[in-house]
């Protein structure tokens, strides 16, 4: 099967060079990888789920983890602190994400989980929301024309979505920084 796969890759990308020149220096693919200032052993896989003990490593049970890499399991609040600390110190983060949800809009380059629970809304907002039809609510939540109130994701909500296969890791992206929306709410800047 490896020969077949390599033939497909060669057809679409061209044959892998034995040697090449970059910035005036000759490399093999292996020597070029070794010349980069990136040591993969300096990077860790961190996640947050309750079906494994916190502060231990485990193999995350998702289809994209085909190399059976282990992840450090930490509480969700600590995972968010790790993300923020990395960004504050000029590190980007690889992120396995679920882009199959209706809160992800590829062409408008936004991903949100809007608050749709009327009990979490204040008086006049809840009254107005209660008068909208289901179709009007969906249009308002997913028009992506202005910031909407976002759901506060808890450890339990994250675990339930994982257990029910609602939250998957169907797409890899890179978190590169933070910004704020028109209302001053923080969000992550992500390269798709």
What annotation goes with each model-predicted range?
Residues 180-184:
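A short, structured loop/turn motif at beta-sheet edges
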Residues 1-178, 188, 192:
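Predominantly the structural core of cysteine protease catalytic domains
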């Amino acid at each position: 099967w490896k020969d077949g796969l390599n033939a497909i890759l060669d057809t679409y990308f061209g044959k892998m060079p034995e040697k090449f020149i970059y910035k005036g220096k000759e490399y093999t693919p292996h020597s070029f990888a070794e010349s980069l200032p990136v040591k993969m052993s300096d990077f860790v896989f961190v996640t947050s789920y309750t079906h494994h003990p916190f502060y231990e490593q485990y193999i995350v049970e998702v289809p994209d983890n085909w190399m059976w890499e282990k992840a450090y399991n930490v509480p969700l609040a600590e995972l968010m602190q790790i993300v923020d600390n990395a960004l504050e110190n000029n590190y980007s983060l690889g992120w396995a994400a679920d882009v199959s949800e209706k809160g992800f809009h590829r062409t408008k380059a936004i991903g949100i989980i809007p608050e749709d629970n009327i009990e979490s809304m204040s008086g006049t907002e809840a009254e107005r929301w209660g008068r909208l039809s289901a179709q009007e609510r969906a249009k308002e939540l997913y028009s992506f024309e202005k910031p909407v109130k976002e759901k506060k994701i808890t450890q339990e909500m994250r675990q339930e979505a994982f257990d029910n296969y609602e939250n998957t890791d169907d797409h890899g992206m890179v978190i590169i920084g933070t910004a704020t929306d028109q209302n001053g709410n923080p969000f992550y800047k992500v390269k798709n």
